[in-house]
Every structure is written in C-alpha cells, then in structure tokens.
C-alpha cells in the first residue's frame, strides 16, 4: 500500500471541522508538530557517561527537544548535575521520571536542587500494572508528590507533577486483568491517586501499537487517553511510543511501506498530530539507542539508532516529525 502524504489528514480536519479518520496521515508545514523527544537510559552500557554530551548534541541537531531519563541518575548527583548542565547548554528539556522507591525527603531535596531547570516531575512509571497492591504503590507516589510540592511552595517555583498510566485492554477478563470490561482503561488508577492526595497536573500515557491496531484497537486506547485528559482537564505527555512489532522480533525498526514496525510508528505519530493534537503536549519515542546487553531480549532493539554513529531508517521518520531535514 502506498504511504500517505503527511498533510492530508490534518487538512481534512481543518476544512471539514470533523475528526480525522484513522487511515489518514497528518502534518502541515505551516503548522507546528507536537514537540518530539526521546527516552534514554543513562544507567545502561549503551549510554556511557563519556558520550553524554554527544547524545545531547544529537538531540539538538535533530530538534528532539525533550529527553525522558533520570530515573537511574536521581540519586547520583554528580552525573545528574552534568546532565542538567548539558541539557541547558543544548536547549533540551529534561523529563525525569521518579520511581516509587524515592522517599519524600529525597524527592524534596531533588526538586529543590533542580527547581530552576526541571519544572515538571513525572512520579511513577507504569504503576497501574496491576490492581493488586495499587493502594500501597499510590501511597508512595503521594509521599513523593508531597516532597516536590513542599519544595515548590517554599521556593515559589511553580513546579508541576505528572502521573503515568498505560493503555489497557478492556476485553481482558482474566485473573490479572487491569480494567476488565472498562473501556476507560486505567482511569481507576488516576481516580485512586487523586483521592489519595496526589494532585497531579498532567498525565503521561504509554501505548505501543501494532500496525494492525489501526481502527478499533487504536481508537480504544487513544480514546482512553482522551477521556483522561477531558475528565481531569489536563494535557497528555505521550512519553513512551514505538512499534509493538519489536516485541515479536523486529530488530531494525523496519522500512517505509513495510505494513509493520516502521509503518506502525508513522501511523501513531500521524494520529497524534491529527486527531489528538489538542490534548497531546509532547511525544517521546522509546528509545534513542539500542541496548544490546539488556537482559530482556526484546528490550535490546527499541533504539532509533544502533549506536550514535548508526541510525536506523526509522530515525529519518522521527526527524521528519521533529521538523528537521
């Protein structure tokens, strides 16, 4: 099937005033794309400290303006200091994610130290993974939130917080189902967190589409995202996305027209920049570099590049949506 021109879907939406159909691509040169960035894992051997500046230089060169990382650096102050300084130098916005392991005191100290550079803190990563123990996990997130809130109030820094959830299959009714019969997906997790005292400002969302998700499944999952944004009157940081075909063995990111990995990523970027651009504030592709030593086999191949010198063809797609040649 021929690839769609990247501006057709948005033209239809603007001219007709209705929703863009799932089969249409998007992007008009005279209109901005949703800001695009990447995820990085600075604890992994694929991300050595010696190449930290090269990574930030590459992001700047490709107009990838945000970098979701830091979860493994948050307690390594010298390394985080360096990352923050480099991000400032190359005009990259850091989007650190705090795991549930930090204490309130640690979160307070972090937020206070970096208040001038890090204005939005994401608290928790995919903590909606199970209903079992959710209350305990949420209580830890609330403690972290309170530490950040106290630092912000003391400094009058205006710091914001983000809560994270994943897409959820409402047709799954098995013993480990997270949202059985509930098309709103992980809304239950947001509701519980809000009730427990986590007064989050933004929501971050994770969904990795298969090419065959176009239509019903993609509408289901992105519909969950929209419902969350509307209920809580906020914006979405879509900060983990790539093709789901990688879970099934794709290692090279695919090629244009493959009706598989490459086309999956192009399709979701098209949809987000079309029907969902009103609620999605930022997108981060998972991830910048392959991690060949990762203990989980499929986690080795999510990179847009094999390494800093060898981009995959899919990087050209990402550069296009980032607005670079």
What are these model-derived regions, one by one?
Residues 44-59, 103-113, 179-194, 262-272:
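Short, acidic/polar
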